[in-house]
Amino acid sequence: MTSTSKDTPESGYAVPPPNLFGVDFGLRLLLLASAVSALVVLVTSKQTESIPTSLPPPFPAFISRDAKFQHSPAFIYLLVALSVTCFYSIITMVASFAAITSPSSSPRMLFHLVLSDAVMAGVMASAAGTAGSVAYLGLKGNSHVNWNKVCNVYDKFCRHVGSSAAVSLVASVLLVSLVVLSSYSLYRRCR
């Protein structure tokens, strides 16, 4: 008995679609690690500096100013997106582990993973882009609107915020990879 289909071997039995949930679980574990590390780096971004003033002598020559992530709505948005991504990755790791232990996974679950991963990828990409643009503005300033750069004064703060935005971008790439992987798995199961 010969078959023209590539999925049917010589014995006549259909080859099951590849189970990629081990790779899925590993990517979700990396997603959790990157989101937690970006979250910790962002939360610890605080620096206090003494800044000289140009006021006459009865006033103090230096004032103390803090730079915190709470001072920027873009960084607060990144904090919320990273927190949601952490919880999301934990929940989907449990679902992925359940799919590994079960003999056959449901196409419905794969479809839900594709949709939710795509939404989370959009949220993380927008948060990373927003925080990255504010960090770049702090690094370079904007001479057209007379916004001065602040990273020459708050160097530690800028390193923390920039690192957090970069690791958040890695989390976004991992989420896009999960969308591609889940889409491929769904395609193989429904074919």
Swiss-Prot record:
InterPro entries: CASP/CASPL, CASP_dom, CASPL. It is found in: Cell membrane. Pfam families: CASP_dom. The keyword Zinc does not apply. Its main location: membrane. Residues 1-22, 95-118, 182-191 are cytoplasmic. The keyword Transmembrane helix applies. Residues 44-73, 140-160 are extracellular. This is CASP-like protein 1D1. It comes from Musa acuminata.
